[in-house]
Amino acid sequence: MADTTSKEVPLHSVQVEALVVMKIVKACAATYPTTATGSIVGMDSNGTLQITNSFPFPTADVAASDSHPNDHMAASNIAAAAPRSKANIVYQSEMIKMLKEVNVDANNVGWYTSANMGNFINTSLIENQFFYQKEPNERTVALVHDVSRSAQGALSLRAFRLSPNFMTAYKEGKFTTENMQKSKLTYKDILVELPIIVHNSHLLTSFLHQMPVELPKKELDFPASLADLTRNTPPTPLYPNLESLDLSIDPYLERTCDMLLDSIETHYTELNNFQYFQRQLTREQAKVTAWKTKRAAENASRATQKLAPLPEDEWERLFKLPTEPSRLEGMLNARQVDQYSRQVDGFTASITGKMFAVKSNLLPEQS
């Protein structure tokens, strides 16, 4: 009864142990810029997914001596598909079996992956999460650790699940315009983000509380006269902090803008492909309409002659309507554009003031 009640409560948050966070950060940083993936284990407690341990998936090593420029991309593609490969499924089962032997939570609750500059919304992420989440009431999440963002001093760790509407559409495999309009599925409905809580053990929390809060202070010996101050000149004079006036734009923002432009270009490519399909469909439908009109006139003429009418469904054999391309790639790209836009919006607060300051100095008559 307890398990049934727990599954009926939807997931509303993810609690990650601090040790697991350190393991994920270390594993992702060790393989950067190649994608790193791994499995996470834990348990579900009243809608809170508690992640208590993790281990990385083994990846294929690429020789650095005779490496090819495409070897990095090949290694990243292999690592991105690692969570659903047969070899890693067996490896994950063996690891969970060994964790059970040492009395560790051995329930698989998802997987983790690394990201670079917020670029993680792709087909591999969807396929991996669908592989874990496809079972009914499967309580799994995907943890995404952005290595480049975390290198700036703030941990970037996010938890995602596929939305129920997207899961239904992905099972059917029909991402056509008609089906998307019926289900009202948009790029915003692909992923559902859950808040993450970093949890420490009671032993570690007690240790942190017992540590001295303030360092012992000792009295400073102030100079008694001007001669003492002149004689003991500080080796490093105090300079004003001018870093806030630096006009150079954050390289992370520049790179994010470049990737945003690439995603927008990809979006227009997908849009042009869909427009080409619509033009082809319109031409074929016009041919079918003309053929049906001609056949209807022939049948009317044959009816006056008391002859058997000709079949009116032969157009299906004579004409082949083009198949609508899947809109999944376009949806994922639109979601990635939204992700980049949010990142740019978070960086423009400190940059906008500098840009207006430069404009007022260069163009004082317009200020």
UniProtKB/Swiss-Prot annotation:
All residue ranges annotated as the MPN domain in the record: 14-166
SMART domains per record: JAB_MPN (SM00232)
GO cellular component term of the entry, any: eukaryotic 48S preinitiation complex
The entry's keywords: Cytoplasm, Initiation factor, Protein biosynthesis
Compartments, record wording: Cytoplasm
Keyword Protein biosynthesis found: yes
HAMAP family: eIF3h (MF_03007)
This protein's name: Eukaryotic translation initiation factor 3 subunit H
Source organism: Sclerotinia sclerotiorum (strain ATCC 18683 / 1980 / Ss-1)
